[in-house]
Each structure stands twice: as C-alpha cells, then as structure tokens.
A protein has these predicted regions:
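Short active-site oxyanion
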Residues: 45-49
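Short, structured beta-strand-loop surface elements
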Residues: 61-126
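C-terminal edge-of-domain segments
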Residues: 115-169
Length: 169
C-alpha cells in the first residue's frame, strides 16, 4: 500500500473515531433503512466494528443482503464520511472482550456473555470523506462571494477524498 493510501486510511480512521456515531443503512426488500450505531473500533485493516443484538431487524437484513452504507457527519467541523462495504455477524468472545465497554450493559444486561449479542464487522469497499479545514466564516465569505458573482460555490478538491479500499493483502 502506498504512503498516500496509508495517509488517506489514517485520516479516514481519525474522522470516524472523532465522529463515532454512524447511520448504518441496510436493505429491506425494496427499501433502505437507516439507524444510528456507535462505532466500537476501526481496526488496523480498516474494518469497522459495532455491537448489536443478533435478533434485531438490522442483523436479519444483513443476513439477506450484506451490502451496507455507513454515514458519519459532524456539522460542527464540517466533516462527513460515507463508506460502502460488506457487513457480517461475528461471534468472537476474544473480540467482544477486547471491545467491551461497561455502557453496553444498557443493551446487554447479561454483560459480555449475553446470548443475544453479536458483533457486526463492516469491511469497506469504498469510502469518501469531506473534511473542510476552512473556518465557517471563511466558507460563509466564499459562499456569499459566489452568490454575489452569480457563480457556483466549489470547495477545494483537497477537501473531498475518495478512497478505494484494498483488503487483498
């Protein structure tokens, strides 16, 4: 993997860890369904991990169609991430132990041994992120300038990155 690809993956991980809350989108027949999910980890390979109830609607949907989208948004910093990938349920006591947090007892009262608990691992295929480094005042000025001039406002190309994931090592 090139240095640039490593830097992009690192920046993507930083954004996800900072934002933390994702909207996980799954397919339900002809409809798309989204729900908020707290990210537990972005591992060294770029896989994204979540805790879930094994018998929830989302896990049933993933069993039928593993293609998901994860959307992260932080309006305060103008940071946005969209990830397309393949989701799967993972039953790994060691991984559960590694990722476990006491707050999870609210959803899994039996703790780490809760029989209804599963992990969802999302292996990204592609991702895009927008991370505007300009302050809101600078952006507002540029937007106002575009309106006055009758031109379209365009963010700089460096603020929009598209990363194709390579998980074949």
């Amino acid at each position: 993997m090139t240095t640039t690809k490593n830097q992009e993956r690192k920046r993507l991980r930083e954004l996800i860890e900072k934002i933390e809350l994702a909207m996980m989108v799954t397919s339900h027949g002809d409809e798309l369904r989204a729900r908020p999910m707290t990210t537990s980890q972005v591992d060294e390979d770029g896989n994204i991990w979540f805790f879930s109830n094994e018998f929830s609607a989302k896990t049933e949907e993933i069993k039928k169609d593993q293609q998901v989208n994860l959307s992260y948004a932080d309006k305060s910093s103008n940071s946005y991430v969209s990830i397309s990938g393949t989701a799967s349920m993972v039953h790994d006591p060691a991984k559960i132990n590694e990722l476990w947090s006491p707050i999870l007892k609210a959803w899994f009262p039996n703790g780490k041994d809760d029989p209804d608990m599963t992990l969802i691992r999302v292996v990204p295929h592609s991702s895009e992120f927008w991370d505007s480094s300009a302050s809101k005042m600078v952006q507002l000025f540029k937007i106002s300038k575009a309106i006055i001039k009758g031109e379209a406002y365009h963010e700089q190309a460096s603020e929009d990155e598209n990363i194709k994931q390579d998980h074949d090592k």
